[in-house]
Amino acid sequence: MAAPGEALTQSGYIEHHLSNLSLAKLGMVADETSFWNVHIDSLFFSVLTGMLFLWVFRSVAKKATTGVPGKLQCFVEMVVEFVADNVKETFHGRNPLVAPLALTIFCWVILMNLMDLIPIDFLPYSAAHWLGIPYLKVVPSADVNITMAMALGVFALMIYYSIKVKGLGGFAKELALHPFNHPIMIPFNLLLEVISLLAKPLSLGMRLFGNMFAGEVVFILIAAMLPWYLQWVGALPWAIFHILVILIQAFVFMMLTIVYLSMAHEDPDH
């Protein structure tokens, strides 16, 4: 929310809710376009949700019993089994990192996405009136910096394992001689393969960002256009539908990560 006592127009309300708490807003860097401008709120909530995932799963793992499990242990085991089954079906290489990575991505993205279901004014209003924080966006996955950082991390792993499994020569050969295995077509092959390669992290990060940002904008528009006592009329149906979006986007991000890493482990002569 805005500073206490400050009235906002409808357009001002929307613009305010789409503004991150950044170093530029605090006057610590020159402007919003600076390379060193960090979105503090997105970074904070992404780390917070990541730590929540680690704490819950570590606690369950430490207290796991072979007897009758509790509800939380059953839920965690269900999630782990679901991810493990998808990894077995999709990943055709041998790498002990892939399943834990897929589990981390799936749960972390879900937790970040779930922040979108918190009433739109609750945390920003509380932060403004109790902590004096003028701007607060609480959905990390609605920030392109977060989603693209995750996508680039997956991309870096894909390149690393492509070179490790196939060798630098094998990786270069894959780029230069596919899809047309003829020396004269190398420039054309390189153009196609490099574009295809760079499109992977771009589509991975932008898909998650686009869906979550759109969902956040709908909640903001509902809050801006309706009085507070009627907001639930529009927000509740959208929230129910949005739960499906939250889960699907986490699943898609996880599955594409597994697919990309599986491609990196493929036999170069496949």
Swiss-Prot record:
The gene is atpB. It is a multi-pass membrane protein. InterPro entries: ATP_syn_F0_a_bact/chloroplast, ATP_synth_F0_asu, ATP_synth_F0_asu_AS, F0_ATP_A_sf. F-type ATPases have 2 components, CF(1) - the catalytic core - and CF(0) - the membrane proton channel. CF(1) has five subunits: alpha(3), beta(3), gamma(1), delta(1), epsilon(1). CF(0) has three main subunits: a(1), b(2) and c(9-12). The alpha and beta chains form an alternating ring which encloses part of the gamma chain. CF(1) is attached to CF(0) by a central stalk formed by the gamma and epsilon chains, while a peripheral stalk is formed by the delta and b chains. GO terms for molecular function: proton-transporting ATP synthase activity, rotational mechanism. Gene3D superfamilies: ATP synthase, F0 complex, subunit A (1.20.120.220). GO terms for biological process: proton motive force-driven plasma membrane ATP synthesis. Pfam families: ATP-synt_A. The keyword Ribonucleoprotein does not apply. NCBIfam families: ATP_synt_6_or_A, PRK05815.1-1. PANTHER family: ATP SYNTHASE SUBUNIT A, CHLOROPLASTIC. This is ATP synthase subunit a. Its main location: membrane. Coiled coil: none annotated.
